[in-house]
A protein has these predicted regions:
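C-terminal soluble interaction/assembly domains
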Residues: 316, 321-414
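Acidic helix-start/capping segments at beta-turn-to-alpha-helix junctions
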Residues: 37-58, 153-157, 187-198, 251-254
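Acidic/histidine-rich, surface-exposed loop or edge segments in extracytoplasmic proteins
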Residues: 2-12, 38, 103, 109-117, ...
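Auxiliary, metal-adjacent structural segments of Zn-dependent hydrolase domains
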Residues: 19-114
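Active-site recognition of the HExxH zinc-binding catalytic motif
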Residues: 28, 129-146, 170-171, 233, ...
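Post-HExxH zinc-binding segment in Zn-dependent metallohydrolases
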Residues: 24, 141-147, 151-199
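Short pre-active-site segment immediately N-terminal to the catalytic Zn-binding motif
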Residues: 109-132, 155-162
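Pan-zinc metallopeptidase signature
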Residues: 205-333
């Protein structure tokens, strides 16, 4: 049973409540052009039980990984209670959610009361739209193997891209349902959605004071799957209808770059696979490699944009071609060695300038550019910079003679 079930706060839907949800299921199926294979189990929980369910899904290993990576990069305060922060953000006033692990659609008690009571209020309409979004997740699970897809190991970059498909699909379907109720076809709106995505009001899905107060890296990675994902899926759907969206689940974008620039998804522009080589001197000094990741264009934009008003430097990150970040630890110290590559020397220069502007004024930090590659180092004793620079230089020279990954002609089917 779910954690909420264990504390006795969950109950099955009544026949009347089931009828209300069934109506929303039919709406989701119609707009998304998919049908459920079997009825979705519905449970009603109060707000505190839902918050507790979501809090219980936070893995301690994920918290420590976030602390290790983003703390070392200066994007999170390593002293913060990250568990409390994530729990607060995730537990804020959730209308309902679909759990692919258990196949349950969980709806908040007071929301359900509103849906079966006086209809027509603004909150009730918002709740209906959000539940259509969640029912689309059930369709994804039953028809497009969402549950299996969630289990795959991915880099942060690939995970941001995967979640953009999942949430962008459900958000576009939700908007399509809202438009349909006003007699407006989705085709009339997909281009506008791509252009206005950042200004759309998605309050029912992503909102809350705790989210507003969260560090930029947390806020961006939680909101981007909805907003950037919506823009991406609008481009895919506008090009090939809902069958193309189904295909995006089967062949998801490989990077956040492909989400942020859908043309790069359509041409399947590959990123550069980068493997940071350990410097023997760093290991001999007692540092151990404890984490590695590819953060991609989305998260590099946050890193490079720490001094900007928005907190993200989309322009500086837009020439991204590949990256790998390695975190080293020695006792209580952590250090970051980050190799990045860019489409052109000019893109690398722009990234280099942005990286230098946010680099700590400390002897343990360094930023260097060679051709279209940029090295970022944080937290590493200055005497170890030269061997790290030497390893990076070999990599930079190796790709110097190579152009960035070529674009591949678009496939006619997506």
């Amino acid at each position: 049973p779910s954690p909420a079930g264990q504390i006795g706060m969950a109950r099955p839907a009544t026949a009347q409540e089931r009828a209300v949800v069934d109506e929303l299921v039919r709406a989701a199926e119609a707009v998304r052009q998919l049908k459920l294979r079997r009825p979705v189990m519905i449970e009603i929980e109060d707000g505190e039980a839902i918050a507790e369910s979501l809090r219980s899904q936070i893995e301690e290993a994920d918290i420590e990984r976030a602390r290790s990576i983003y703390g070392t990069l200066g994007l999170l305060d390593a002293e913060d209670d990250l568990h409390a922060m994530f729990a607060g953000v995730l537990g804020e006033q959730v209308i309902g959610y679909y759990d692919p692990e258990t196949g349950r659609l969980v709806i908040r008690e007071d929301v359900m009361s509103g849906l079966t009571g006086a209809l027509g209020s603004e909150q009730t309409q918002e709740a209906r739209l959000v539940l259509v979004h969640e029912i689309v997740h059930a369709l994804q699970d039953q028809r497009l193997s969402l549950g299996e897809s969630y289990q795959k190991e991915r880099t942060s970059d690939a995970d941001n891209a995967f979640r953009a498909v999942v949430e962008g699909d459900a958000t576009l379907a939700m908007l399509a349902h809202a438009l349909r109720q006003q007699g407006i076809p989705l085709s009339a709106a997909t281009e506008g959605i791509q252009q206005l995505g950042n200004h759309l009001d998605l309050n029912g899905l992503v909102q809350g004071e705790k989210l507003d107060d969260a560090p930029t890296i947390v806020r961006v990675t939680l909101i981007a799957p909805y907003l950037r994902g919506l823009q991406f899926i609008a481009a895919v759907q506008g090009r090939g209808g809902w069958p193309a969206v189904n295909n995006a689940h089967r062949r998801p974008p490989l990077s956040s770059e492909q989400v942020l620039h859908p043309d790069k998804y359509f041409t399947r522009e590959p990123s550069e696979a980068i493997v940071v080589q350990d410097s023997p001197q760093v290991l001999a000094a007692g540092f151990k490699r404890v984490a590695e990741d590819t953060l991609g264009e989305l998260e590099l934009g946050v890193y490079l944009g720490q001094l900007t008003l928005s907190g993200a430097a989309d322009q500086a990150a837009s020439g991204w071609a590949g990256d790998q970040l390695v975190i080293y630890a020695r006792n209580q110290e952590t250090a970051a060695v980050w190799w990045t590559s860019w489409d052109t020397d000019r893109d690398a220069e722009e990234a280099f300038n942005a990286a230098r502007s946010v680099s700590p004024n400390a002897p343990t930090a360094m930023v260097e550019r060679k051709g279209r590659s940029v090295l970022i180092v944080r937290g590493l004793p200055a005497k170890l910079h030269r061997p790290v620079r030497n390893e990076f230089s070999k990599f930079a020279r190796a790709i110097e003679g190579q152009p960035a990954p070529p674009e591949i002609p678009p496939s006619p089917v997506y």
